[in-house]
Curated annotation (Swiss-Prot):
Example of a GO MF term: ribosomal small subunit binding
Descriptive protein name: Ribosome-binding factor A
Disulfide bonds: none
This protein's encoding gene: rbfA
Database matches in Pfam families: RBFA
Subunit structure: Monomer. Binds 30S ribosomal subunits, but not 50S ribosomal subunits or 70S ribosomes.
Entries under Gene3D superfamilies matching the protein: 3.30.300.20
Function: One of several proteins that assist in the late maturation steps of the functional core of the 30S ribosomal subunit. Associates with free 30S ribosomal subunits (but not with 30S subunits that are part of 70S ribosomes or polysomes). Required for efficient processing of 16S rRNA. May interact with the 5'-terminal helix region of 16S rRNA.
Family, similarity comment: Belongs to the RbfA family.
């Protein structure tokens, strides 16, 4: 079992190389049509499995197609990582669609809408805020 520092270092190297491969290595149009970015890489302590979280900009169908493209490109990506990182055993890649960015934008939109409604109502007469 690898130590924490090694696991973190391997995750960092995988993230860097995966970012490069997504831009220059993957030729699958499903992946290239949406804007795909890696948000997080988590490597298991035994260095056998790697969870790659990706954020995908585009419509729902484009996001689904990009995820399908990433899953089909996983063996190619793993092989490229093996060549580039020179590891004895390259972790198996599992892709996860990270919807946190889209949810964050949605929350910010709701907060803006609430602020607009509050400004339309004007100040509360007694000086205290409503709950």
């Amino acid at each position: 079992m690898a130590h924490g520092r090694r696991v973190e270092r391997v995750a960092s190297m995988i993230r860097r190389e995966m970012s490069e491969l997504l831009v220059n290595g993957v030729r699958d149009e499903r992946v290239n049509q949406g804007m795909v970015s890696i948000t997080n890489v988590v490597v298991a302590g035994d260095l056998q499995h790697c969870k790659v979280s990706v954020s995908i900009f585009g419509s729902e169908s484009e996001q689904d197609q990009a995820m399908a493209g990433l899953r089909s490109a996983a063996p190619y990506l793993r092989g490229e990582l093996s060549r580039r990182l020179n590891m004895r055993r390259t972790p198996e890649l599992v892709f996860h669609h990270d919807k946190g960015l889209a949810q964050g934008v949605e929350v910010l939109g709701l907060l803006s809408k609430l602020e607009e409604e509050r400004q339309e109502r004007g100040p509360v007469p007694d000086g205290s805020e409503e709950m």
